[in-house]
């Protein structure tokens, strides 16, 4: 009888999770801007706290942040919409340029008596760089579509920041089973917030370093759309493991096609070097053991949240999974499931 009851509860829990995920998937147009606003508010909360500690009135700190966030969003939307439109119009020429570059390479190799033949027809049939460029355009326009309603998005962030001092206590009261558990739940919420703030803060710094490095490199090499590629590198660097690779491929392809092999290979080496230094030296040193997620879980979370919430889900995959792991750790009944998400180092 007890086994049947446990099985019934398990099946009921699985069904509830499936229904919730289906609801989130259907309501993605509402959920995605809300999540984006929530994480922006979480990132900005230490700034508000630092300003109020320096005796800046709370209302003035929020007003200044409102102006700053609005300017950043207007810049991003304006940049992506204007540059991406021009970039999209230039995509058809990439196939022709590829044929020219391969012809140049064939002539160079034949000059040194190296056998290499590849006809224009073969190139036209099997290689299409516009596929990569169209993907980049879709990603940019997708993100732009999410943040295009700047005013509403910023207002939600500001209201969240205004409610932040009391929101933690309210939420703790909702999830507490008894009044005596409120303080304990507040500590659990603090753990979630500190983990997410720490990760997003460090990731923002390293993403900014990557974006600035890419911009300086492309400007020095006179590669077209340098500001667009720098912005793309900044945004996609939030995607763990593969984000920097996704950002690097179209940059290298465009540099090879528009600027020639010399500059193209130079850009490839430069972009790889920037990502190696930031991703393998600076970020691990700053991050330390803060992440607490296994590599497999990071990759699977990227696929799952990307499927559920699109591009923004990929950007927020790690903080969402970190929040889930910490939330599972906070309850004795679910702590064992948190072990599945943790790094092997946590259990040594």
Curated annotation (Swiss-Prot):
Regions that span the bilayer = 7-27, 28-48, 60-80, 139-159, 196-216, 223-243, 245-265, 267-287, 296-316
* Species this protein is from: Haemophilus influenzae (strain ATCC 51907 / DSM 11121 / KW20 / Rd)
Which family is this protein grouped under?
Answer: Belongs to the autoinducer-2 exporter (AI-2E) (TC 2.A.86) family.
The membrane-topology field of this record reads: Multi-pass membrane protein
Q: What is this protein called?
A: Putative transport protein HI_0338
Give the principal location in a single coarse category.
Answer: membrane
A GO BP entry is: transmembrane transport
List locations, semicolon-separated.
Cell membrane
